Amino acid sequence: MTLTMEAIYSKDLNAVLQYNANMANPNGNFTGPDSRPRYTSSGARSVDGSVREAMVLSNTKKGGSFSYSAILTKGFTKGFYGQLSYSFNYALDVSGNPGSQAASAWSNLASYRGNNNLLDPSVSQFSIPHRITAVVSKRFEYLNKSMATTISLFYEGSATGRYSHTYSNDMNNDGVTNDLLYIPATRQEAAIFFPNTAAGIADADIFWSYIEQDSYLKKRKGGYAEQYGGLFPWVHNIDMRFLQDFSVRTGNTKHTLQLSVDVLNFTNMLNRNWGNRNRLVYGNGRILRWVSNTGAGVPQFAVNTVSGQKPIKTFETSPTVSSTWGMQVGLRYFF
């Protein structure tokens, strides 16, 4: 049995960063609990109104990562093999470059500062903090080793990605639809952000219930959601492999016909509620849309609908092949 451990620390020295040189500093602020910067008009956000964007490719030293892994391995003993591994990762960056061009990589960043040029390091969209894998395999030989059966199980457990809680439209007039959510500290504070109408009061109740059922938002009450602060739930997945060998020897040559059966997401085959991946009920977690500001400058919102329904939970099962089991059958000949 062997144990292997590894730790890696890295520091960004010249990480890629884009910024819009035509972006002016915000010229106002909202009032109330969410007093983030804003632009009072669309014209106020540009240094030169005749130019839409002036993207500059730059570098930043802000950011870094730490990772740790441990692997415990049990070598082949009487046909048995086993391995257990754990990995931890924490990474910060200013930009993970979430776009195909400089402009989209810049505009796809989420912020509450009112200007995507003014960003601090946040958790990387690629940073999955914990991951566990395991392999167990056993080979059985019989009939004078003319036949053999191998059964293997492969386990993986981890979160499946990160996301940001943002509004579904441009609340601060910066021209970018990626403003991070403010999470009210109390139910009474939440009411400030919705019109004092029957629909507004109902939306405030829905929003507060949504916060209470979301483990991340509950911890951020009275503050802003973080860029890629949301983490998708863990998925526990087991794959199974079955190998059946049929061997004969002619002279000095051994001929083996091997039948293989691979069951992907074997957990889901056992129970349709197991091995399921999750997706956000409303696209990218954008459950609120900005509708107006009060005369005093307090932003007002409405809860978005999903297929005519108001969202009451963060996640739902993703109806894709990744949430279902599959089978592969193969036949190989060795000589």
Which positions does each model-derived feature cover?
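Outer-membrane beta-barrel and related beta-rich outer-membrane complex signature
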Residues: 4, 15-25, 94-102, 161-179, ...
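Gram-negative outer-membrane beta-barrel transporters
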Residues: 4-146, 151-160
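Intrinsically disordered, low-complexity regions of eukaryotic proteins
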Residues: 8, 14, 36, 50, ...
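Extended hydrophobic/aromatic segments used for targeting, binding, or gating
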Residues: 23-32, 38, 47-50, 99, ...
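C-terminal substrate/ligand-recognition segments
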Residues: 77-82, 225-249, 253-259, 263-270, ...
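Extracytoplasmic gating/loop element in the C-terminal half of outer-membrane beta-barrel translocons
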Residues: 150-251, 258, 283-316
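CBM-like carbohydrate-recognition segments
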Residues: 319
